[in-house]
């Protein structure tokens, strides 16, 4: 007698690997998915494939040499990563930053936010099937990369923020280029919203997908757009202002439902608020020095090194030995595009950190995938991962 389906008493779920070689994995993410048909029962993230030992490397480098390693953490938010490191060094060494340098750092922190969020819109749209967003966003992103390059000579690994200020002043004409971009960027955001915000397919793919309540967001340690998307109006730029953020006015956009759609809307509004911040900084910024005048800490100006022996000696000492910080410990955090990036820095009084601990926002967000994905279809996993906006440089470190 042929067997029938009723003869089998047990049906088992099956497991599949999502990534690490997958275009929607946003890096080297490996998810072990347990499926009941097409419904996700469990999603276990496996991390560590991009581990480079950054925290240990920082113990072997001077405080100046440590800055480029932060460019390579979240390599889509380069100057924001540097920001946390230099602020930690400045607080531990009680190093003062000139006012103009504070404004420049604030401007470039917001430009970095644009660069990151534009990539988020582009990649998230591509994950869901909206390829036009990819083309539109890279049009504006290219302008911003040129603005990056004009200030520091690099499009990605900037090494522009330094303890005590920035590497060099803005070249002639760059302030006007930034103003021009801020004048037309809101109309481009309107174009993005025309394409996506009320798009029926976009809303079907994002609304009620990956919902996170306020309580769960706090429990998982969410920060940045992930926390604000769940309705919590917390932003380090307001709560613990640094550089010029206490001198500018801006609002904190928050979501209502805590789903992928709200996280998208929060990032759109963050771009609009970033335009306001940059415009206020440009209006308030005055000519002046852009780095601390103690050349035992800050690099002397290149034109001085060509004429002054003392400046050349300072440069040689900083490049070979760096500078010493007093013994102690400090925690500094900044509001990067992905959330709170924190640096816990311990000094034993030498020219290198005794210990440097990095708190990456994306690590906490990735932990929650197993809860966010449970009960959703397998096609929704790419939406959830995209809405988190993860980069494995900072997660694996």
Curated annotation (Swiss-Prot):
Keywords: Cell inner membrane, Cell membrane, Membrane, NAD, Quinone, Translocase, Transport, Ubiquinone
Signal sequence bounds: none
Membrane topology classification: Peripheral membrane protein
Catalytic activity: a quinone + NADH + 5 H(+)(in) = a quinol + NAD(+) + 4 H(+)(out)
One Pfam family named in its UniProt record: Complex1_49kDa
Superkingdom to which the source organism belongs: Bacteria
EC assignment: 7.1.1.-
MF terms in GO: NAD binding; NADH:ubiquinone reductase (non-electrogenic) activity; quinone binding
Any one of the GO CC terms: plasma membrane
Top EC class, one word: translocase
Annotated SUPFAM superfamilies: HydB/Nqo4-like (SSF56762)
Location of this chain's protein in the cell: Cell inner membrane
Subunit structure: NDH-1 is composed of 14 different subunits. Subunits NuoB, C, D, E, F, and G constitute the peripheral sector of the complex.
Role: NDH-1 shuttles electrons from NADH, via FMN and iron-sulfur (Fe-S) centers, to quinones in the respiratory chain. The immediate electron acceptor for the enzyme in this species is believed to be ubiquinone. Couples the redox reaction to proton translocation (for every two electrons transferred, four hydrogen ions are translocated across the cytoplasmic membrane), and thus conserves the redox energy in a proton gradient.
Family, per entry: Belongs to the complex I 49 kDa subunit family.
NCBIfam families: NuoD, PRK06075.1
Protein's recorded name: NADH-quinone oxidoreductase subunit D
Gene behind the chain: nuoD
């Amino acid at each position: 007698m042929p067997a029938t389906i009723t003869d089998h008493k047990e049906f088992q779920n099956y497991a599949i690997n999502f990534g690490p070689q997958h275009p929607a994995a946003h890096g080297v993410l490996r998810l072990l998915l347990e499926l009941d048909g097409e419904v996700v029962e469990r999603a276990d993230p496996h991390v560590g494939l991009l581990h480079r030992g950054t925290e240990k490397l920082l113990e072997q480098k001077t405080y100046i040499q440590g800055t480029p390693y932060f460019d390579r953490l979240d390599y889509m938010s380069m100057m924001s990563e540097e920001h946390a490191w230099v602020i930690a060094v400045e607080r531990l060494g009680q190093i003062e930053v000139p006012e103009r340098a504070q404004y420049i750092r604030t401007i470039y922190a917001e430009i970095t936010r644009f660069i990151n969020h534009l990539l988020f819109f582009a990649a998230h749209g591509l994950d869901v099937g909206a390829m036009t967003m990819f083309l539109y966003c890279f049009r504006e992103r290219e302008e911003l990369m040129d603005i990056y390059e004009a200030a520091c000579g690099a499009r990605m690994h900037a090494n522009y923020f330094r303890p005590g200020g920035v590497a060099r002043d803005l070249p002639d004409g760059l302030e006007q280029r930034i103003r021009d971009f801020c004048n037309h960027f809101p109309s481009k955001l309107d174009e993005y919203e025309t394409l996506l915000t009320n798009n029926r397919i976009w809303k079907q793919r994002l609304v009620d997908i990956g919902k996170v309540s306020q309580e769960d967001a706090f429990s998982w340690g969410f920060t940045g757009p992930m926390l604000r998307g769940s309705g919590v109006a917390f932003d380090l730029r307001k709560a613990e202002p640094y550089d010029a953020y206490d001198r500018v006015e801006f609002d904190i956009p928050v979501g209502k439902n805590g789903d992928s759609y709200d996280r998208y809307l929060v990032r759109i509004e963050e771009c609009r608020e970033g335009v306001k911040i940059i415009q206020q900084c440009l209006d308030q910024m005055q000519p002046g020095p852009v780095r601390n005048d103690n050349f035992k800490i800050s690099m002397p100006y290149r034109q001085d090194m060509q004429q002054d022996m003392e400046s050349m000696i300072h440069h040689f000492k900083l490049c070979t030995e760096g500078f010493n910080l007093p013994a102690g410990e400090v925690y500094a955090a900044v509001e990067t595009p992905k959330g709170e990036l924190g640096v816990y820095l311990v000094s034993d009084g030498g020219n290198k950190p005794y210990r440097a601990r990095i708190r990456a926002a994306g690590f906490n967000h990735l932990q929650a995938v197993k809860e966010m994905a449970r009960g959703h279809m397998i096609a929704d996993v790419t939406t959830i991962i995209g809405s988190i906006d993860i980069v494995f440089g900072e997660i694996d470190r």
